[in-house]
Curated annotation (Swiss-Prot):
Pfam families: TFIIIA_zf-C2H2 (PF22110), zf-C2H2 (PF00096)
Alphabetical keyword list: DNA-binding, Metal-binding, Nucleus, Repeat, Ribosome biogenesis, RNA-binding, Transcription, Transcription regulation, Zinc, Zinc-finger
The protein's role, per its UniProt record: Involved in ribosomal large subunit biogenesis. Interacts with the internal control region (ICR) of approximately 50 bases within the 5S RNA genes, is required for correct transcription of these genes by RNA polymerase III. Also binds the transcribed 5S RNA's.
UniProt protein name: Transcription factor IIIA
Zinc finger intervals, C2H2-type: 12-36, 42-66, 72-97, 104-128, 134-158, 161-187, 190-212, 219-244, 250-274
Cellular component per GO, a single term: nucleus
GO biological process: ribosomal large subunit biogenesis
Protein source organism: Anaxyrus americanus (American toad)
Length: 339
């Protein structure tokens, strides 16, 4: 008789109530606990990326999406494909280079769908039998689903999305959109480490930091006999419209003001001088889109604004003259070194 294999005891037990998960390694338990706490102890350090992960392995795999590296190369002759993980490479080899894979066919009448895994076939067949064996475990909820993925998506409505920006913040969003809205409104302010200016978004701070570089890209005005240079395309466009095209179509309607501007953003920023307590510019609400619409990649066309019946003289002059920002290219001229 052969020797008995040693029994592996799962001695790492989840301490959360109503959770019976057990593991044979502590690191697996620690990763599991993050599902209860919402923690992501391994954050991505790339600028502008706010993603976090429950394991170092998942973080290292994510970093490859920033670097573009694909260290796992297919060793099959005449195949030059490479992958970010060994598991993806093995899956590719199995599908593309091994003998024809076994397929599982649905035997229900007029169906015949094929699946690579028996479990996929089994879940698919629940559609034909009208079974919903995956039940929500949340107390007081009796909803059932035909697949684990649909159940998992539903359970998020109970668990929610806890705020990870501040450990003392008690906010829990019912949906990911609620969480993102909360984070943008209350936790998105970032500070420049050089001049202490604050910004609502990391992208704004990233653009601002360019002014502190010893070497920066500058844009020269393309108009003849004009040597003005600017550090942003926005300022160059504003210069062309204001000084070369004499276009200042955006008029401040505040009583006793009447200042005009070449760019709408400049007018919006100017409004704050009349209302110093205004924290931020109000953006028009965006139309609500379903999750399926966003995942499909479809981008709805922007609706054209209706022309107002009354216009200021400055607005009328804009319609009669060409758009200088479209007519002139805005080339990068040189790297300016500050001494």
């Amino acid at each position: 008789m052969g020797e008995k294999l040693p029994v592996v005891y799962k001695r790492f037990i989840c301490s959360f109530p109503d959770c019976n998960a057990t593991y044979n390694k502590n690191r697996k338990l620690q990763a599991h606990l993050c599902k209860h706490t919402g923690e992501r102890p391994f954050p991505c350090t790339y600028e502008g990326c706010e993603k976090g992960f429950v394991t170092l392995h998942h973080l290292n795999r994510h970093v490859l999406s920033h670097t573009g590296e694909k260290p796992c190369k297919c060793e099959t002759e005449n195949c030059n494909l490479a992958f970010t993980t060994a598991s993806n490479m093995r899956l590719h080899f199995k599908r593309a280079h091994s003998s024809p894979a076994q397929v599982y066919v649905c035997y229900f009448a007029d169906c015949g769908q094929q699946f690579r895994k028996h479990n996929q076939l089994k879940i698919h067949q629940y559609i034909h039998t009208n079974q919903q064996p995956f039940k929500c475990s949340h107390e007081g909820c009796d909803k059932c689903y035909a697949s684990p993925s649909r159940l998992k998506r539903h359970e998020k409505t109970h668990a929610g999305y806890p705020c990870r920006k501040d450990s003392t913040c008690p906010f829990v969003g019912k949906t990911w959109s609620d969480y993102m809205k909360h984070a943008a409104e209350l936790h998105s302010e970032v500070t420049c480490s050089i001049c202490n200016r604050t910004f609502k978004r990391k992208s704004f701070l990233k653009e601002h930091k360019k002014i502190h570089r010893e070497e920066r890209i500058v844009y020269r005005c393309p108009r003849e006999n004009c040597d003005r240079t600017y550090t942003t395309k926005f300022n160059l466009k504003s210069h062309i419209l204001t000084f070369h095209e004499n276009l200042r179509p955006f008029v401040c309607e505040h009583e006793g003001c009447g200042k005009t501007f070449a760019m709408k953003q400049s007018l919006d920023r100017h409004f704050n001088t009349h209302d110093p307590e205004k924290k931020k510019m109000v953006k028009p609400p965006r139309p609500v889109r379903s999750l399926a619409s966003r995942l499909s990649g479809y981008k709805p066309k922007k609706s054209k604004k209706k022309k107002k019946p009354s216009q200021t003289p400055a607005m009328e002059s804009q319609e009669q003259q060409p758009d200088a920002s479209k007519a002139d290219p805005l080339p990068v001229l040189e790297n300016l070194t500050l001494k």
